[in-house]
Amino acid sequence: DKFDVLLANPPFGKDIKVKGEEKLKQFDLAYNWKKEINTFSKTNKLKKEETIQILFIERSLKLLKDGGRLGIVLPETFFHAPKSRYVLHYMLRNNNVTWMLDLPHNTFRPHNNAKCVVIILEKNRPQQDFINMAVAEEIGHDHQGKEIYRWDYIKKETNKTELWDDIPLILEEVES
């Protein structure tokens, strides 16, 4: 069965490896990839191990119907680390990225220190001419997990009834 919508948050805070030929050969991303001009191609050489987060991306895409939507949380470093380029290529080829949401560093703190981005894409659809982008400056809590509230500029005090969380505003935009 395939899904219309899939939301994913791969376990990227830990270095969990998948090993074993039987498991790995199920995944294109468990093979070595060769860089070519403006692209990457899969080789026939299977790796000895791969991180679960990379395989999570591929499995998420395979579980979607054509035209299905994937919302996936990824570490920001994934987008600029040279060793992840082939994975980024795999994820973006033949798919339409509709949104990129930059999350605040405190999003998963105090339990995880990773700075994250959410990608929303449509499977097997041509890339539209633009990608919607949003930056959430606050997520409703600080680095220790304590709630933070919006500042009331008129009263010059903290509004104790409204969490400072930009995500609901961004979700309104995504849904429209």
Residue spans of the language-model regions?
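S-adenosyl-L-methionine
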Residues: D1
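A conserved structural/catalytic subdomain of Rossmann-like adenosyl-cofactor enzymes
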Residues: D4-S176
